Amino acid sequence: MTLFRQNSALPNFLDSQRDSFRYFLETGIREELDFFSPIVGQSLGSSSKRPTDRFISVSFHSKDFYFKKPHYTPQEAVQKLGTYKSSLIVPVHVYSKYLNLNATFPVAFCDLPLMTEHGTFILNGSPRVIVHQIVRCPGVYLKPQFDKQGNRTHLVSFLSAYGSWLRFETDKKGVVFAHIDNLRKVPVTVFLQALGFSMDTIVGALKYPEALDPTLKEVDWKLTTDEAILLLMSRLFPNRPATVLRGRKFLFNQFFNPRRYSLSDVGRKRVNQKFRMRSKTKHLTLTPQDALAALDYLLRCENGETEFLDDIDHLKNRRARLAGELIQTQFRLGLNRLERVIYNRISDENILRKTPGALGSLNSLIRTQVLASVFQEFFGSNQLSQFMDQTNPLAEITHKRRLSSLGPGGLNRDRAGLIVRGIHPSYYGRICPIETPEGKNAGLVGSIATFTQINKNGFLESPYYKLISESNTPDRNGFFLLSAFYEEDTVVAQGDVDLSNFRIPTRNKSQFTENTVQEINFLGLCPIQFMSIATSLIPFLEHDDANRALMGSNMQRQAVSLLRSERPFVGTGLEAHVTRDIGATIVAKQNSYISYVDAQRIDYFTPVIGDTNLIDYQNLTAEDVFASNQFKHNTIWLTSYQRSNQDTCLNHKPLVEANTWVEAGDCLADNAATAKGELALGRNILIGYMPWEGYNFEDAVLVSERLVYDDVFTSIHISRYEVSTARLREGQEYFTNQVDRNQYLDEFGVVKIGTWVEAGDVLVGKISPQPDSDNDPESRLLRAIFGGVARNTKTTSYCLSSGVSGRILDVRCEFKRQTKNIEDESIESTGSVYVYLVEKRRLQVGDKVAGRHGNKGIVSNILPRVDMPYLQSGKALDMVLNPLGVPSRMNVGQIFECLLGLAANTLKQNFKVLPFDEMHGAEVSRGFVYHYLYKSRLLTQQKWLFKPNSPGKSIVFDGRTGLNFDQPVTVGYPYILKLVHLVDDKIHARSTGPYSLVTQQPLGGRSKKGGQRLGEMEVWALEGFGAAYVLQELLTIKSDDMIGRNRAFMSMIRGTLLPKSGIPESFKVLVSELRGLCLDMSIARINF
């Protein structure tokens, strides 16, 4: 629990990522190097008579390590498809008497990927994110368990950071067993006596010694330590001879060797707190006293003292492993492998003797490739290292603040039950109860709440105001950060409660209760404290069902950046904070003078003196700034049409002009998904809730062609095509422009920048060698004379696929070898070519659009604007939604947003509405919206904006006939998003394609060039209509009747009648499966 005195409790959203990696660089590396240093081994082949002469010592100077300057900046790594990394240099001291070695050399341990200031890692030109992992905290846990008959017993388990696990559990007879890993159970008295306790000491330490009687009947209850060790080993390993030395070594390696077992600092604190140990031992390994205390607590639970039981899903028992800790774990794994390599090479004297000199011996000892392979494996294939979601800035910041229960050491999604996926009361203010994926990962992957901060131990903390008991008012001069452990013993009220009430809803010990204001200890900050960033961006959230709010949170992250961004008329106030923390917008850090602005960079001058208030900005001219030595010149490089991981466009748009002054905090440049420094994911458009000729049935959406022609929902997408040459068995492939349709290719055979290309155009010309079909003496003679010129070749140029067109944005070539042909002066090159194609996608039928309240739909038709329904003012609607999609889904918040947007458009102002405004009174949202609708009516003198008989509704006219519709229609300006699920990326057709080898049915999916499959429900529909012949065709010659479909294909070519269908392949598979079950099934033809 920490007291903070600052103006805002809203943290920087990326501090947890950056602070964790900074701790690893400054402290974590040194800790691991100290842990493994020194490495002392013995050379087995030494001829020295004294054993001490055969030792070789390798020590790491942990305090003197340093990093080399990265080869690329983050921007250069993205552009050149490189990795933003730095070499870790560690001074290594090697001492060996018999090798005459005593020297220190700097060793490049590994190339460590570095985190950028925005919390990402750049590998091979692609930004990646390491997701926070939430796991069980190391420590000791007591919990009940039930057998098949429903008998309740108890179990105490030690959970370590790494190493073996130990459990004490009782059976239905009351016997207490010790369980080590997956070995056999042994009576707990045998285990404790093997640790050195006498039976009198064990009994004297227990509150209920009589509860141990069933256990004492199992074995001889008085044993010496050696006898207990022998009995323990004979029980655990019945097939091996038991010795005291082997038993002591086993126990030491399992629980007392710091190299193999550790509770970690957090686990040791938890054990000491749980057992209330007076000694407060700081050993990170297990101690015999820990095991004895665990037995005492287990027996106390068996005798009814259930207050010691732990709730494993409580956040006080779970902690977050951040990026720095996860990388430190991999660094420890790599050093462990390096240690084994050094041991093995020390024992082999021949390796050391082969390499003369001190440096040669050092290089033969230390092979740092093992460290490189560990990091490559972690960043490339670990479940927690993911491609960053760059669809928009909200998706990026949400990805960096994600919490996952999956991954190494975590849960398995296939075995996770409903309890662990559910919402625990301790989540309040720490983990968002709304935002989670739909599907298998529901409840296992979550998002950190908006105000949550993560402390150094990995526990999630939420800020609260301290309630002053004398005045019953919160102390707003500072706030306390409470973890779930400290919050358990306090009485906490939400931030939107009325303190003047006699009974106030509160939380205490994970229970929701009511207390008086005198009994409350802490008060929440604001109503959005328990929500994630994406959820807190939904206005009028309190009027939405939680399931729809979940969809709205997720779909905001899927919104593509539009060609023309626009701020929402109705926001919540967090839009600007999101973009600044993620670096989407460029903000002035101090008062500056802008000297030059273009699409690539912004040049500015900043004062170098300490007190900037002494500068007279009003009377300073440009000449004064340039000539003065009080100002320093700086340059900000802007991102210009850069491809993201999701093929969307990353682009900065300058907001400032040259020769102007800006203040600290001013927004200098916008992102593609921001407007005036605020998050802008969609557009405010005029919609109406009404049915229209069935075109908006269910979740279909009817739109106006204005949205297409005015580029309202037009987005820019950048695709990357990679073409490489390879050395085949027949020869080397190469790039060339000597191919067909080469009008757009340059001298290297690569398409020119700025070219407009369409489907079928050649992007990269390439020639591949072909195997010779003839092997006669003449061909061999020609090859012997002219070399490879006479070989057969074929054109394997890369052509643009169907359905794609656009302009070539950039071309990057990495040529390995170039040769010039003397005859036609063409250049033949080998290597790799990367072609970037930019395309502008307008809204079309099949695209997915959505609001912020989970209201989503597919564009079903694009109407001419003259046919769209229009208002009394003559303005045509832009979109028509189905009104039946509101009541059943219970997301009424979209109606409030729609009507308030109408008032905002009329009054030419934007609204910031925090969720849960009902704290100010009943029906506050309705009254707020009606007030501004009435105000807009008075301002414009248009009575249709607010009618008392039908507030929020208006008479709408049919654009085709000019007649008004029978009922008033709700119209307004909600914020509509265009989602990344575009029809151009999903539509697919095929004439022929691959089939499954087993069922001979078409494969599924666009990526596999799959086809349609007739499922059960489709068959039922055809059966209902009695379409027997159509059904027979679809199940045989059009599906998996191999012989029949080949005959049908030939008959269509020859123009003859279709043949009779045969037996489908899937039916033959069914017969084979039945035969595999020893059910012989034969097929016979019966002629009627």
From Swiss-Prot:
Domain of life: Eukaryota
Protein name, entry field: DNA-directed RNA polymerase subunit beta
Protein's cellular compartments: Plastid, Chloroplast
UniProt keyword Chloroplast present: yes
Job description of the protein: DNA-dependent RNA polymerase catalyzes the transcription of DNA into RNA using the four ribonucleoside triphosphates as substrates.
Molecular function via GO: DNA binding; DNA-directed RNA polymerase activity; ribonucleoside binding
Subunit structure as annotated in this protein's UniProt entry: In plastids the minimal PEP RNA polymerase catalytic core is composed of four subunits: alpha, beta, beta', and beta''. When a (nuclear-encoded) sigma factor is associated with the core the holoenzyme is formed, which can initiate transcription.
The keyword DNA damage appears for this protein: no
Gene that encodes the chain: rpoB
Gene Ontology process terms (BP): DNA-templated transcription
Reactions catalysed: RNA(n) + a ribonucleoside 5'-triphosphate = RNA(n+1) + diphosphate
Enzyme Commission identifier(s): 2.7.7.6
Gene source species: Ostreococcus tauri
Keywords: Chloroplast, DNA-directed RNA polymerase, Nucleotidyltransferase, Plastid, Transcription, Transferase
HAMAP family named in the record: RNApol_bact_RpoB
Enzyme class, spelled out: transferase
InterPro entries recorded: DNA-dir_RNA_pol_bsu_ext_1_sf, DNA-dir_RNA_pol_su2, DNA-dir_RNAP_su2_dom, DNA-dir_RNAP_su2_hyb_sf, RNA_pol_bsu_bac, RNA_pol_bsu_CS, RNA_pol_bsu_protrusion, RNA_pol_Rpb2_2
Family: Belongs to the RNA polymerase beta chain family.
